[in-house]
């Protein structure tokens, strides 16, 4: 059975969805005012992998990841660039989908935007006001935190301790330092919407509560996001949602660890970030994904050139093993007798993979299992007697397990040296038979694979570009 580490209880728990066989999952997406950096890609990859594994285990997953497309940073950036917020956010939403798509992150089933959810947000706040959990103050609306008695349960903090660390400045409009804004009164030259409290726009926390409810209902199976969102964002989501809906908001809370540079969190505010599209100019997308999966999603990762090179070498080992099996399959004639011992090893490897992923989506252990598969594949590829059926089983298991992790092998295939030599011999034979069309076809095929041919007096020489 799948066990997930629930941040709400701080322990691993058996995963039991609300509706048998179905999973509702909400992930806090980006505020779209800039390109995403490598740290932003961590939750995208981590929770895409959770979704993939749940699907692999037979669940029907409805996956929602939002775009925050109205925010102080968005407004400020749009003003600096002299463009409207819609143009800005559309550009960065497209960029987000392109960058995460390059990392083989599947699009969500629903990508809601705040600006498309305004009616539901306003109704949500109105309901909180009716219940006595919200109050209006000079056009702003705040959540009355002291009325929600279990506030702090996600971050394991008491209201008293939180209040002791807060203060209300003179002239501030809140009743309590812990109260947070649900609706902001309109300011000149900012996007605004009509509401019962006058023109304005929503606060950040209420947006996710409303979008989750609209697309997944009052109680969802899994809510996920970065560790930095646990407090106050997720804490406030719980307070709003449970106060409004009189129901538990989410049964499982998953939080991914940070990506650090020089042991400090990668972030735009610190200026120590690396944009994904810049990183991918130097790092293969599958290597970057493999790098992140090599560490458990809850643990921090230190990003460095040395560790990226280690990930590249590890991914290369797995690819080469896959290609060795492909080549042996291509030159193996006849059916042959299937290897029972190899098939037993494959069954054991698959069982170990599932055991690792059942344990709170432990991709670090799952990657170790891939190395076990690569080792056994290399041994079998060199065996004197092999069977096509067994070779095909090895390839199938590679595709199955890497597919669960969102890693692609077949699409990245490079020609092996032996395959290149074989094609060159075929080209030589075609030229000798004056079949120049076929010879040119082979030359073009090799060129597409970045293989350059040079005809010399001693024969054809080739090199990789």
Curated annotation (Swiss-Prot):
Annotated binding of ATP, by residue: 268
Main location class: cytoplasm
Keyword Methyltransferase: no
Reactions that this protein is recorded to catalyse: tRNA(Cys) + L-cysteine + ATP = L-cysteinyl-tRNA(Cys) + AMP + diphosphate
Pfam families the record matches: DALR_2 (PF09190), tRNA-synt_1e (PF01406)
One Gene Ontology MF term: zinc ion binding
Family indicated by similarity: Belongs to the class-I aminoacyl-tRNA synthetase family.
Name this polypeptide is given: Cysteine--tRNA ligase
Source organism of this protein record: Exiguobacterium sp. (strain ATCC BAA-1283 / AT1b)
């Amino acid at each position: 059975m799948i066990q997930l580490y629930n941040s709400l209880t701080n322990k691993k728990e058996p995963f039991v969805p609300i509706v048998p066989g179905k999973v509702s999952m909400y992930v806090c997406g980006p505020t779209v005012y800039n390109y995403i950096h490598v740290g932003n890609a961590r939750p995208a990859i981590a929770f895409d992998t959770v979704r993939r594994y749940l699907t692999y285990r037979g669940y029907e997953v409805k996956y929602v990841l939002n775009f925050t497309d109205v925010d102080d940073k968005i407004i400020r950036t749009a003003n600096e660039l002299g463009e409207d917020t819609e143009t800005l956010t559309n550009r960065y939403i497209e960029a987000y989908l392109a960058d995460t798509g390059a990392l083989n992150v599947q699009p969500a089933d629903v990508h809601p935007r705040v600006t498309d959810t305004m009616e539901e947000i306003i109704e949500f706040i109105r309901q909180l006001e009716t219940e006595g959990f919200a109050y209006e103050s000079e056009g702003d609306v705040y959540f009355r935190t002291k009325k929600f008695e279990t506030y702090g349960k996600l971050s394991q903090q008491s209201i008293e301790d939180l209040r002791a660390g807060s203060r209300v400045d003179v002239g501030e409009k809140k009743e309590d330092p812990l109260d947070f804004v649900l609706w902001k009164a309109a300011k000149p030259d900012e996007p605004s919407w009509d509401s019962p409290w006058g023109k304005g726009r929503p606060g950040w926390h209420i947006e996710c509560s409303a979008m989750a409810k609209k697309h997944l209902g009052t109680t969802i199976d899994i809510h996920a996001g970065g560790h930095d969102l646990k407090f106050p964002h997720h804490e406030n989501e719980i307070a709003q949602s449970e106060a409004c809906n009189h129901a538990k908001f989410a049964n499982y809370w998953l939080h991914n660890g940070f990506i650090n540079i020089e042991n400090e969190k990668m972030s735009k505010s610190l200026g120590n970030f690396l944009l994904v599209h810049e990183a991918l100019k130097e790092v293969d997308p599958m290597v970057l994904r493999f790098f992140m999966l090599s560490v458990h999603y809850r643990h921090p990762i230190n990003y460095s050139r040395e560790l990226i090179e280690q990930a590249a070498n590890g991914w290369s080992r797995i690819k080469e093993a896959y290609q060795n099996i492909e080549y042996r399959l291509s030159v193996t004639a006849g059916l042959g007798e299937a290897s029972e011992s190899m098939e037993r090893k494959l069954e054991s490897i698959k069982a170990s993979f599932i055991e690792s992923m059942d344990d709170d989506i432990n991709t670090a252990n799952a990657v170790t299992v891939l190395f076990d598969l690569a080792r056994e594949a290399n041994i079998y590829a060199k065996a004197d007697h092999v069977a096509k059926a067994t070779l095909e089983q090895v390839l199938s298991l590679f595709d199955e397990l890497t597919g669960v992790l969102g890693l692609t092998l077949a699409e990245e295939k490079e020609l092996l040296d032996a395959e290149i030599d074989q094609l060159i011999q075929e080209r030589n034979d075609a030229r000798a038979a004056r079949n120049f069309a076929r010879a040119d076809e082979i030359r073009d095929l090799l060129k597409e694979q970045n293989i350059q041919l040079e005809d010399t007096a001693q024969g054809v020489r080739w090199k990789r570009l």
